[in-house]
């Protein structure tokens, strides 16, 4: 696919712009490591590891006037901190998150309060079993992922 074909692909599918790095690479017909995506906040280009982390965190690409941006690791941490400080709503401990939401822990979406990673079921169950806090921030639930929990010496 040459440059003109890539541009026409994005123009003809305006309602279906890629939302992940993997989808972007596939749409452009290039390897993932050849994607060059700037951070929406600092403007630095994400390195290969950050591109992979972006998709693992289940974050979505940001499109403005058909220009794509993402969020680098440092800006994810800064964004998580800002949102926590500005939009904090409440805290519940462990399994009390199920009482607060009326849903099973298996059905509740939780992101890391530090890095914005999407917590998997093992991480959520670990927080529940240890009675760790879940925080409601900007309408969504936050906990601590397996990597960030080491910041608290909680292993």
Curated annotation (Swiss-Prot):
Please state the residue ranges covered by unnamed zinc fingers.
39-75, 112-148
* Superkingdom of origin: Viruses
Q: Mind telling me which Gene3D superfamilies this protein's record contains?
A: E6 early regulatory protein (3.30.240.40)
A GO cellular component annotation here is:
host cell cytoplasm
**One GO MF term, please?**
zinc ion binding
Predominant localisation class: host cell
GO aspect biological process, one term: symbiont-mediated suppression of host type I interferon-mediated signaling pathway
Q: Does the keyword Zinc apply?
A: yes
Where found in the cell? Host cytoplasm; Host nucleus
List keywords of the entry alphabetically.
Activator, DNA-binding, Early protein, Host cytoplasm, Host nucleus, Host-virus interaction, Inhibition of host innate immune response by virus, Metal-binding, Modulation of host cell apoptosis by virus, Transcription, Transcription regulation, Viral immunoevasion, Zinc, Zinc-finger
Q: Name the InterPro entries for this protein.
A: E6, E6_sf
HAMAP family registered for this protein in UniProt? HPV_E6
Instruction: Indicate the quaternary assembly.
Output: Forms homodimers. Interacts with ubiquitin-protein ligase UBE3A/E6-AP; this interaction stimulates UBE3A ubiquitin activity. Interacts with host BAK1.
Functional note = Plays a major role in the induction and maintenance of cellular transformation. E6 associates with host UBE3A/E6-AP ubiquitin-protein ligase and modulates its activity. Protects host keratinocytes from apoptosis by mediating the degradation of host BAK1. May also inhibit host immune response.
**Family statement drawn from the similarity comment of this UniProt entry:** Belongs to the papillomaviridae E6 protein family.
Name of the protein: Protein E6
Q: Which organism is it from?
A: Human papillomavirus type 8
- Gene (name only): E6
